[in-house]
Structure formats: C-alpha cells, structure tokens
Curated annotation (Swiss-Prot):
Tryptophyl-tyrosyl-methioninium (Tyr-Met) (with W-97) crosslink location in chain: Y220-M246
Recorded name of the encoding gene: katG
Annotated organism of origin: Rhizobium rhizogenes (strain K84 / ATCC BAA-868) (Agrobacterium radiobacter)
UniProt subunit comment: Homodimer or homotetramer.
Protein name: Catalase-peroxidase
Leader sequence segment: 1-45
Keywords annotated in UniProt: Heme, Hydrogen peroxide, Iron, Metal-binding, Oxidoreductase, Peroxidase, Signal
Length: 732
C-alpha cells in the first residue's frame, strides 16, 4: 500500500466513523446504564456463523492424537522463547491456572469457560506476564485441529497434558467450552484505575464483593504478601479469603498451591523497568506480543515476569513431594530477588546446589519460597493440612488432582455439558447434581389436566407466578448454576431466603406437592411428574390464565423432564451465594448498596442471559401479574392485577402523571395526577428507569402502543419460557 503523505498535520480521513472514535456517550455520562452487556457475543461478532455447533464439532476430535501432539510440544523448546528446564509444562500449567483462576463464586463470572485470556484486560494483566508466549506456542496445534477444539478447551487441556507429561495422574478432562470473539464487558474487575491498585478493601481488610483477587490485575493474592509485606500469616488471611471466593476450602487451597509449585519457577532476573508494554499497548509490529524485555536476551535465563526468582523443588519438571520436603526441611530467611522482590531462602546457606538452573546446566541453586508458600507452614490450619500431605503423599496427589479438576471445570455447569472420553464417572457435590429421569414423562393430556387442577387449587395467579419465577430465576449464565431443575427452592438454603417469602412459599409448595402426590399415586404405568416440573407448569398455567383475563388465548410452551434434587445433593454453603441481594423483576432489594437498583437489575438480567427487550417485557408483565416480593404495590401500574396487559407501560408513559421522591424513602417515588395532585401510583427506581433511560424508554414505548398488546403478550410468554428453560441444557 502506498502511503504518500502530503501534509503530516492533517488526517486524510473524515472523523465521522473511525475505529478509534471520539468521546463516547459513557465519556460524557459515566453513570449511564450499560445496556451493552445484554447484547454481547451476538452472531454479528461470531465468524463461525449461527449454524456452528461446537459440541458436535468436538465429538469429531481425535483427542488421543491431539494429546500426543501436546506431549511432543512440551519438550520442543523454541529459540524465540526457550523452555525452562527444557520443558514447557510449568508454563502451560500457569496458563491454564490463570485462565480458570479468574472465576469467582459471587456472580459466577470469570473462569476458563470462554477463552477470555485471549482478550483484554486479561491478556495484559500484570499477573499474566508472558502467557502470550504460551498461547503462541499452542497456535500451530490450534491451527492443525481447527474448530474441533476451542481455545477455551485447549488452554485447559494443555494444562492437564502438562501435568501428565511430568508424571502426574489427573482426575479427568471435560471439553465443551465454546469460544467467544470479544472481551467480556459484564465482569466487574474492580474500580481501581492503576494496575495493582487495591481500593477494593475497606474496614478491617474487607474485600469488596464479588471480587476474588486482592489487587487489580492479579489472579488471587500478591505472592510477596499483602501489598508486598512479607508476612506469611497476613498472607494466609488473604489466601483463605480469595480462594474461598474461588470455591476452594482450606484443603483444596493447600493442594493447589503446593501442587502448582511442585513444578517450574518464577522469573525475576532483573529490574522490571526493563520490561516493555503489555500486549494491548504494544506496537503493531509486535503482533500481539507484549512485555518485550531489554534485559540481556529478554528470554531464557534473562526472563522477567513476576519479578520473583524462585525455584521450589529439586525436580521442577517431575511430580514429587519435594515442595513439602523443602517447606518443612529448611528454616527460612527473607531475601530479595534480582528484581528486588521479597522472597525466602534457607537459612545459613542450607540447600545450596540442590536445585538445577532452568537454562545453564553448569549452575545450581538453593531452593526458594514465596511468602505465600510459607503461609502453608505458619498458618495453623494450613500447617496441619500441609503436614498431613507431607506425611501422606498419596493423599496430597489425590487432593491436588481433585482440586485441579474443580479449578478448571467449576464454571462449566452441570455434568450434562461435559464432553469427551476423559470425563470422570464420579459425581461431585460442587457440580450441583440432579437425579436422572427414571420414569415416564407426562404427556399433553396430563399437562392439560394438571393445569386445570392447579388453577382450581385456590392459589392466586400472583403466587403461582412468583413461585415459578423464584425457582427459575436463580439461574446464572455465567457459571450455569441455579435454575428450576432440581426444585431446590423447596430445600435449604433457598426455601428460607427472604426474597422467596418463606411462609407464602411453604403454602404454595404444600399445595403443589399435594397435586403431585395425587397424580403420581394414580399412575399405573410408572409415569410421574416431578415437583420441579410442576412448579414451572403452575407458573405457566397462571400466565395463560392472566393472558386469557386480558382477552388473549395463548399456550405457554412447556417441556417436562426436570427432576427433584435431594438435600444431600445440595451443598448449603455453596448455594448460599445464589441468594439474590436484589431482584428487580420482583421489585426486591435486600439492603442499600454502592451501586444503584437499576444497575443491579441490568446485572441480574445479564446473568439470566436476557436481552434489553426481554428484560423490558418481563418487568412490565411481572408487575401487572402482581408478582412483587411481599405483594408490594410499587410499580403495579394497573387497576386490573393478575391480567396480562401492557398497563405498566401505558401508565408509566402517561404524561398526566408527575413523579416525585417519596418522603419515606429515596428509592420510592409517588406518581401524582398533574391536575389534582392525588397519588395515582407508587414506584421504585427499577420501575421509573423504563421511562427515564432513553434506551429503555424506547422499548417501553413499543410495548405501550395501542397496536402492540398482542405482541406484548407473545413477547412476555417467549421471555418467560426462556427463563423457565434456562437450565434445560437437555433441550438445546
């Protein structure tokens, strides 16, 4: 391309539609609701097209051949990025760990499930320095196997193969992680505007929810200790908090740290000032490589990544118990790496020469440890576990295998989504197991008869709708947890959540259980209806009745096949994180938070995988169905509740109503008649945002039009069915 420049002071492109752009709306109005998170990963950004089915493509994969190629790669050291100790295994373990380790239980976001390590910000986080090289080493293999293996699956599988190639027996591997093609905009990584900032803490080192890392740009903890303070006990507190937020208990935490640090080394050959820009900030000729170093050769023995220069074991490319042997076998003193980072070395020169150099066979070293490694010895609870693993290597190996599998598969959802020949047969409690269907399913006539019995039970439409919603709306598209399947709404902890109105819920469930028992007892063919199915069917029957009340005959799609989980299959502590702190669809908020109710609504909608139109029609419909928590009348803008009309939108958009903040609460508003000043309605910020936000108002206007009442009902039913079936992966 010729690039003749006549006037260097002028840009030859008209600044109307440029890739860089000028100030965005969010630059001008930083508090504007971000509805873009509801429309991520559309077909417009997917080069594979809407017909592509990754699960079907993965089934064609020759996994054995792929693993053979990965095994060969482990020791095929490249001059442009030489392998430490002649083996890429430790680098690939770090890559897989850091892909999966962003997962947090609070909202289920992060994790390895979509291959987000390829994109900003993760590809340029300080904790991911030089993992760009690991992914580039994999490119020839990804190129060879194409769409039969996603990047997301390949990153995790490569970590598994790395472990196996160094003599470790893994617990298993499941494929099924489909790639996305753009960075995730829905994940809140923190409010800091500098790398390694930690404004996320308040009070007595209280970490902001839902974050699970101690500083911006780290996967979990600072290996030097809190803010670089080399205190193993203080570090242990951080470790326990952050690993718990990644769904790990103390035993799993010790196993993961010790197991991961059995292999490889950290890199701090020189001053970090030698390291250049991260991949996103790099020059175009770097082609996505980052952190170019001017220290020596910038690679091999001159590599600078974390700034720490630590080799833990005498056999860094072989599984062993040597991490614990060294941890307990030496007394440790504080020292500094060549880059000036705090780390630990054996006292009095002990251990000198027992550890190999990563690149020079003529050099030997003493073992070394991170502050966070010493936490496993000096924290009393961690020490007890570490000592047991030290004395029982088989227990350590089993614990690490299981914890590694959990780390790399936690965000995949239920076992039905696991693909491939290496899926372990053992059912694990953290997978939220649900019994398989072991009976004949109800048919169309049964469904009609059950609907009739439900509607004749005396339960009001509002309670049937709110119960079905409460059961299904726990679903999170982030980690595919929650949902109506399993009927866990009848079990602890969900049955006792405030948002679910426990007293009312118990009444509804008792009535539905009576209908279920009568139906099942009457069957001679082994046919049954589960309570999970009946709860959803009851809500759908109520929606149909409400539509009929409005003059619309419509059938809500229903697919039986849900089963009922037991309390023994339900980890109460694990499910506690699914409790909504807010559910704008039910006009519920548990407390006062730093972010607004309307932002919490958008977040909830995104977790439910809803679009902005689906969000809008659901809120409008649920309000007129009187489904608010506690039957609050805020936002019930209708004189005919339990009738599926577009009254919410008609009355919200009525210019005869003026809104003012209630004297009783800054979150509640009074809608007064402009002429008489009489109160017509009350509403929350959730309700009023559909008239205030320009995008949501545009959608509300569609549903408030006189010619869209039938469309409103159809769209509500479609969105309702989507939520009811959100966890029905068997229907996909």
């Amino acid at each position: 391309m010729d690039t003749k420049v006549d006037n260097a002071g002028k840009c030859p492109v008209v600044h109307t539609h440029t890739a860089h752009g000028g100030r965005s709306n969010r630059d001008w109005w930083p508090n504007q609701l971000n509805l873009r998170i509801l429309h991520q990963n559309s077909s417009l950004s997917n080069p594979l097209g809407t017909a592509f089915n990754y699960a079907e493509e993965f089934k064609k994969l020759d996994l054995e051949a792929l693993k053979k190629d990965l095994f060969a790669l482990m020791t095929d050291s490249q001059e442009w990025w030489p392998a430490d100790f002649g083996h890429y295994g430790p680098l690939f373990i770090r890559m897989a760990w850091h892909s999966a380790g962003t997962y947090r239980t609070g909202d289920g976001r992060g994790g390895a499930g979509a291959g987000q390590q390829r994109f900003a910000p993760l590809n340029s986080w300080p904790d991911n320095v030089n993992l760009d090289k690991a992914r580039r080493l994999l490119w020839p293999i990804k190129q060879k196997y194409g769409n039969q293996i996603s990047w997301a699956d390949l990153l995790v599988l490569t970590g598994n193969v790395a472990l196996e190639s160094m003599g470790f027996k893994t617990f298993g591997f499941a494929g099924g992680r489909a790639d996305v093609w753009e960075p995730a905009e829905d994940v809140y990584w923190g409010s800091e505007d500098t790398w390694l900032g930690d404004k996320r803490y308040s009070g007595d080192r209280d970490l902001e929810k839902p974050l699970s890392a101690v500083q911006m740009g780290l996967i979990y903890v600072n290996p030097e200790g809190p803010n670089g303070n080399p205190d193993p006990l203080a570090a242990a507190r951080d470790i326990r908090e952050t690993f718990a937020r990644m769904a790990m208990n103390d035993e799993e935490t010790v196993a993961l740290i010790a197991g991961g640090h059995t292999f490889g080394k950290t890199h701090g050959a020189g001053d970090a000032a030698h390291v250049g820009a991260d991949p996103e900030a790099g020059d175009i000729e770097e082609q996505g490589f980052g952190w170019k170093s001017s220290y020596g050769t910038g690679k091999g023995g001159d590599t600078i990544s974390s700034g720490l220069e630590v080799i833990w074991t005498t056999t860094p490319t072989k599984w062993s118990n040597n991490f614990f042997e060294n941890l307990f076998g030496f007394e440790w003193e504080l020292t500094k790496s060549p880059a000036g980072a705090h780390q630990w070395t054996p006292k009095n020169g002990a251990g000198a020469g027992i550890v190999p150099d990563a690149h020079d066979p003529s050099k030997r070293h003493a073992p070394s440890m991170l502050t966070t490694d010493l936490s496993l010895r000096f924290d009393p609870a961690y020490e007890k576990i570490s000592r047991r693993f030290f004395e029982n290597p088989d227990q350590f190996a089993d614990a690490f295998a299981r914890a590694w599998f959990k780390l790399t598969h936690r965000d995949m959802g239920p076992r039905v989504l696991y693909l491939g020949p290496e899926v372990p047969s053992e059912e694990l409690i953290w997978q939220d197991p649900i019994p398989a269907v072991d009976h004949l399913l109800i048919d169309a006539k049964d469904i009609a008869d059950l609907k009739e019995k439900i509607l004749a039970s005396g339960l009001p439409i509002s309670q049937l709708v709110s119960t079905a919603w409460a059961s299904a709306a726990t679903f999170r598209g982030s980690d595919k947890r929650g949902g109506a399947n399993g009927a866990r709404i009848r079990l602890a902890p969900q049955k006792d959540w405030e948002v679910n109105q426990p007293t009312q819920l118990a009444t509804v469930l008792a009535t539905l259980e009576g209908i279920q028992k009568a139906f099942n007892d009457a069957q001679l063919s082994g046919k049954k209806v589960s309570l999970a199915d009946l709860i959803v069917l009851a809500g759908s029957a109520a929606v149909e009745k409400a539509a009929k009340n409005a003059g619309h005959d419509i059938e809500v799609p229903f697919a039986p096949g849900r089963t009922d989980a037991t309390q023994e299959q339900t980890d109460v502590e694990s499910f506690a994180v699914l409790e909504p702190i807010a559910d704008g669809f039910r006009n519920y908020q548990k407390g006062e938070y730093t972010i607004s109710p309307e932002e919490l609504l958008i977040d909830k909608a995104q977790l439910l995988t809803l679009t902005a139109p689906e969000l809008t029609v659901l809120v409008g419909g649920l309000r007129v169905l009187n489904a608010n928590t506690g039957q609050s009348q805020h936002g019930v803008f209708t004189k005919r509740p339990e009738t599926l009309t577009n009254d919410f939108f008609v009355n919200l958009l009525d210019m005869g109503t003026a809104w003012k903040v209630s004297p009783d609460s800054k979150y509640v508003f009074e809608g007064r008649d402009r002429d008489t000043n009489e109160i017509k309605w009350t509403g929350t910020r959730i309700d009023l945002v559909f008239g205030s936000n320009s995008q949501l108002r545009a959608l509300a206007e569609v549903y408030g039009q006189g010619d869209t009442q039938e469309k409103f009902v159809r769209d509500f039913v479609a969105a309702w069915t989507k939520v009811m079936n959100a966890d029905r992966f068997d229907l996909a």
